[in-house]
Amino acid sequence: MSFDIAKYPTLALVDSTSELRLLPKESLPKLCDELRRYLLDSVSRSSGHFASGLGTVELTVALHYVYNTPFDQLIWDVGHQAYPHKILTGRRDKIGTIRQKGGLHPFPWRGESEYDVLSVGHSSTSISAGIGIAVAAEKEGKDRRTVCVIGDGAITAGMAFEAMNHAGDIKPDMLVILNDNEMSISENVGALNNHLAQLLSGKLYSSLREGGKKVFSGVPPIKELLKRTEEHIKGMVVPGTLFEELGFNYIGPVDGHDVLGLITTLKNMRDLKGPQFLHIMTKKGRGYEPAEKDPITFHAVPKFDPSSGCLPKSSGGLPSYSKIFGDWLCETAAKDSKLMAITPAMREGSGMVEFSRKFPDRYFDVAIAEQHAVTFAAGLAIGGYKPIVAIYSTFLQRAYDQVLHDVAIQKLPVMFAIDRAGIVGADGQTHQGAFDLSYLRCIPEMVIMTPGDENECRQMLYTGYHYNDGPTAVRYPRGNAVGVELTPLEKLPIGKGLVKRQGEKLAILNFGTLLPEAAKVAESLNATLVDMRFVKPLDETLILEMAERHEVLITLEENAIMGGAGSGVNEVLMAHRKVVPVLNIGLPDFFIPQGTQDEARAELGLDAAGIEAKIKDWLA
C-alpha cells in the first residue's frame, strides 16, 4: 500500500530518527496517534503481530527521541512489539510487506537495518546481549548508551534473571525497560508514581544517593540506617525491591502511554551510571478497543476489516494438528487422572484451551520457561504421574540439556508433543522447526514418531503416552490435517514402518509431514512408498528389505538433512554393508526465511513437483 501523506501529515515528516528528533515535543502526541492509526491500517491489510505494537507506540517514539539511535543501541526482546520501531527507522513504506516472502522480517533483524542491534525471535535474550553490548561500549569509550526493552512475559524466563544478576555484579551502564502490559507486577500507576519516577530518575536524587553513601561510608550504622530509610520511603510506593536486590536502580512504575512524561524520565535516566531499571505500564492493543478487550486473540492477526472489530472466522474446514492434539488430550484425560499437561506459555497455539478449562488442576502453564517445563515434567514422572510437555519444535531447543539430563538419562516416561515441526512459515528463521529430529535422534533410548496424517498422529500420541520405558516424542506440523478417517486408538508396534504402496526399482522412505506429497510422487514414478513412522528406533528390517529389493532408496523428511532421519537410514545401511544409492531429501543447510509454508516448500523443492524433479535430476 502507498503511504497517504494527507492522512498521516506528522508521520510523513518522519522517515528516520534524525527527522523525529527535529520535531517539537508538542507534536509528539499527534505523531503517536498517527503512528498507531497507520499501524492498524497496515497490519489489518497485510496480517502480522498486532496488539503488542499498539501498546509500545509512545515508548518507541520517546526512546528514539531521547537516544541518539542508531549510535545508541536499542535492543527489543522477542520483537512482537517492534513494528513501530521499524516504521520510525526508515521502513515505514514497507511495513505492509512484513512476514511476507521477500518482505520485512517479522522481528528486528541485523541484516535488515542498522537500527536492529540484535536479531531476535525467541524471548528473554535482550538483557544478556545488552550487558555484552554495554561492556563493549564502555571499552570503546565513545559514550554509547545501551537500552533493552523486555516484556512482562519475557522477563519471567530464567535467562532474564540470570542476566540481571550478572549486571548487578559487574554494574555496566545500561537501561532495562520493563514493558508491563498485563498488570502482572503492579497496578500502582498514577500521577503520584509518575511524579515520583521523575524525581527518582533525576540527577539531584542520584547525586544525593551516591553522595550520601560517600559521606556516611565510614559510619556503618548510619549508612545502614540511611539505606534502610531510603528503601522504606521508596518501598511504600515503588514495587521494585526485587530489581533493587539484583543491583538495579529501579524507577517506576510509570504511564507508558504518556509520551511527554516518558521523555522526561528517559532524559533523566540517560546519564545515570550503572544498571538502571525503568518499569512502564502499557495496555496491549492500546487505541483499538477490540484488541484492548481481547489482546490474546489480537496478538497476531490475519487480514481483517478494522471497522468490524472482528477477525475473520475459520472456514470450518479440516482441523489443525494442534486441535487434533488438544482433542486427544481431553479424551485421554477424561479416562486417566494421572495425565498432566504442561505448556511454556503457548496454551492457545498448542491447542490446550479446552483442556485448561476442563482440567484446570492438571494443566500447568509455566510461562516462558522451557527448561523448567521439562524438569518439572521429570518431577511429575518421578511422582508417578504421566506428564505431557506440549511445546513448539523451535522452543524445545531451549531445554535440550533438561531433555538429556533430567529425563532421558533417568528413563522417565515423559512425552513431548512437538508442535510446529518442519516449515512454519511467516515467522522466519527463528521459528522454523527444522532441527528436532537431528537433536533428539542422538539421545539414547528416545522413541521418536513422525505421523503422516491426523489419524496416525492420534495413534502415536496414544502409543507414546502408554510407553513406560523412557521418553517419547511425537512431532507434527503447523497447519491443517489431511482429512483421513479417525480410527479407534491402539498402540503401534514400536519401531515398525508400514508399506503404503508397492512399486519397482525405487523406494521412497517417508518420515512424517510430506506423506501426501510422497504418495503423489510414488504414483508418478511407480515407486514403492514406505511410511516409516518411527525415526527412532528405525525399522532396520524394513530398511534392509527395501535396499535388497530396490535399485535406489529415497528418504524424505521435513527436517534438516544433516543428522536427520535420512542420516539414520544411511547409518543402518553402512552398518550392514549394504551398498545402495540413497538420496536424502529434506531441509537444506541454511536458515529458512519467512514466507508461507507453500511458498517455502515450493522454493525448497519439497512439494510433489519439486520432490519428483529432485529424484529425476539425481537419477539422470
Curated annotation (Swiss-Prot):
User: What job does the chain carry out?
Assistant: Catalyzes the acyloin condensation reaction between C atoms 2 and 3 of pyruvate and glyceraldehyde 3-phosphate to yield 1-deoxy-D-xylulose-5-phosphate (DXP).
Concerning InterPro entries, the annotation shows:
Dxylulose-5-P_synthase, THDP-binding, Transketo_C/PFOR_II, Transketolase-like_Pyr-bd, Transketolase_BS, Transketolase_C, Transketolase_CS
Keywords, in A-Z order: Isoprene biosynthesis, Magnesium, Metal-binding, Thiamine biosynthesis, Thiamine pyrophosphate, Transferase
Q: How does it assemble?
A: Homodimer.
**Which gene is this protein's source?**
dxs
Q: Which GO terms describe its biological process?
A: 1-deoxy-D-xylulose 5-phosphate biosynthetic process; isopentenyl diphosphate biosynthetic process, methylerythritol 4-phosphate pathway; terpenoid biosynthetic process; thiamine biosynthetic process
Enzyme class label: transferase
Name any one GO molecular function. Answer: 1-deoxy-D-xylulose-5-phosphate synthase activity
Report the transmembrane regions from the record: none
Q: Which PROSITE patterns match?
A: TRANSKETOLASE_1, TRANSKETOLASE_2
The cofactor note from the UniProt entry for this protein is: Binds 1 Mg(2+) ion per subunit.
Give the protein family.
Belongs to the transketolase family. DXPS subfamily.
NCBIfam families associated with the record: dxs, PRK05444.2-2
Its recorded name reads 1-deoxy-D-xylulose-5-phosphate synthase
